[in-house]
């Protein structure tokens, strides 16, 4: 916080000195007074370099000043600078951590004011060059030395003001960035301070709950284990009873099958005996008839012998 206030004081003092008597301001150097690290600073550097070239009022500059070439170039460079500046400011706003709303609003307002002053300075430079072009066009064929002298004086003053406002904007952006970083660090510290006691309370509560609930949990676990063992024993007994019942049913089935097989064997033997009783008399009768037939045939052959057959001889 001390660092933030120190930067604010330095910025305010610089602004007060810059708003003093213009005659006391030092001559503007040819280069910007800081390193162009940020894109908006680089864009402003290109604007500054082009303006320095215009201030030389060389023959080429004099020729281009009579057209809209210079003002168009300055317009493009000015728009590039403002675009990059807005992007950098938005980036800082996104990085802003927890900070008092009043401080945030004040810093944003100061940066916006400095940004507006810089834009107005660039606009004045462009308008002054446009005015010079109009004056030159109205004095065709006449000497323009006096116009060039006045333009040189105006450009010198405008460049001083541009440099002053650019440095002021850079300082305020530095304060804005420092405030964002310090606000974020302070916010993290405040969050840590608020959460620290809560975390400690939660840790103690967890420890107390663990110590107080250990015994009931152990008893509940033992009771649950006993119920599970009882259920397992009950299921085991039921399984054994069921197995014994199935074994007895299998024995009954086997006995019935053996009994039915014995009955079928007895019935087969009885049927075989009946068949034998049916066919044996028929067989004996057929054998007897066959024997009688053979005897009759033999007796007939014996009583009626067959005479030998005579074969006629062929004549010689």
Curated annotation (Swiss-Prot):
UniProt name for this protein: Apolipoprotein E
Subcellular localization, as worded in the UniProt entry: Secreted; Secreted, Extracellular space; Secreted, Extracellular space, Extracellular matrix; Extracellular vesicle
Classification of source organism: Eukaryota, Metazoa, Chordata, Craniata, Vertebrata
PTM comment, free text: APOE exists as multiple glycosylated and sialylated glycoforms within cells and in plasma. The extent of glycosylation and sialylation are tissue and context specific. Glycated in plasma VLDL.
Sequence repeats: 76-97, 98-119, 120-141, 142-163, 164-185, 186-207, 208-229, 230-251
GO terms for cellular component: chylomicron; extracellular exosome; high-density lipoprotein particle; low-density lipoprotein particle; multivesicular body, internal vesicle; very-low-density lipoprotein particle
Positions in coiled-coil regions: none
Record region (Lipid-binding and lipoprotein association): 206-286
Molecular functions per Gene Ontology: cholesterol transfer activity; heparin binding; phosphatidylcholine-sterol O-acyltransferase activator activity; phospholipid binding
Residues with PTM Methionine sulfoxide: 139
Positions that bind heparin: 158-161, 225-232
Repeat among keywords: yes
Region entry LDL and other lipoprotein receptors binding, spans: 154-164
Region feature 8 X 22 AA approximate tandem repeats, mapped onto this chain: 76-251
Phosphoserine modification, residue list: 143
Top-level taxon of the source organism: Eukaryota
């Amino acid at each position: 916080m001390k660092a933030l206030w120190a930067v604010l004081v330095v910025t305010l003092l610089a602004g007060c000195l810059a708003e003093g008597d213009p005659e006391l301001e030092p001559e503007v150097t040819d280069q910007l007074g800081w390193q162009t690290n940020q894109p908006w600073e680089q864009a402003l550097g290109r604007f500054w370099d082009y303006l320095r070239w215009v201030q030389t009022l060389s023959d080429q500059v004099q020729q281009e000043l009579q057209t809209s070439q210079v003002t168009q170039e300055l317009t493009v460079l000015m728009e590039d600078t403002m675009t990059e500046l807005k992007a950098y400011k938005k980036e800082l706003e996104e990085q802003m951590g927890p900070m008092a709303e009043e401080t945030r609003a004040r810093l944003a307002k100061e940066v916006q004011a400095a940004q507006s002053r810089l834009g107005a300075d660039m606009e004045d430079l462009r308008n002054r060059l446009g005015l010079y072009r109009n004056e030159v066009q109205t004095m065709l064929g006449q000497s323009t030395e006096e116009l060039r002298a006045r333009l040189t004086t105006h450009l010198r003053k405008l460049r001083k003001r541009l440099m002053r406002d650019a440095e002021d904007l850079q300082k305020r952006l530095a304060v804005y960035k420092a405030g964002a970083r310090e606000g974020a660090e302070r916010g993290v510290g405040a969050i840590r301070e608020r959460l620290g006691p809560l975390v400690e309370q939660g840790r103690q509560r967890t420890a107390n709950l663990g110590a107080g609930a250990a015994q009931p949990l152990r008893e509940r676990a033992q009771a649950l284990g006993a119920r599970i063992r009882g259920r397992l024993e009950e299921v085991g007994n039921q399984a054994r009873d069921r197995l014994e019942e199935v074994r007895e049913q299998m024995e009954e089935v086997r006995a019935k099958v053996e009994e039915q097989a014995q009955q079928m064997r007895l019935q087969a033997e009885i049927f075989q005996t009946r068949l034998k009783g049916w066919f044996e008399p028929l067989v004996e009768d057929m054998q007897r008839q066959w024997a009688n037939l053979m005897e009759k045939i033999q007796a007939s052959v014996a009583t009626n012998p067959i005479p030998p057959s005579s074969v006629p001889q062929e004549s010689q």
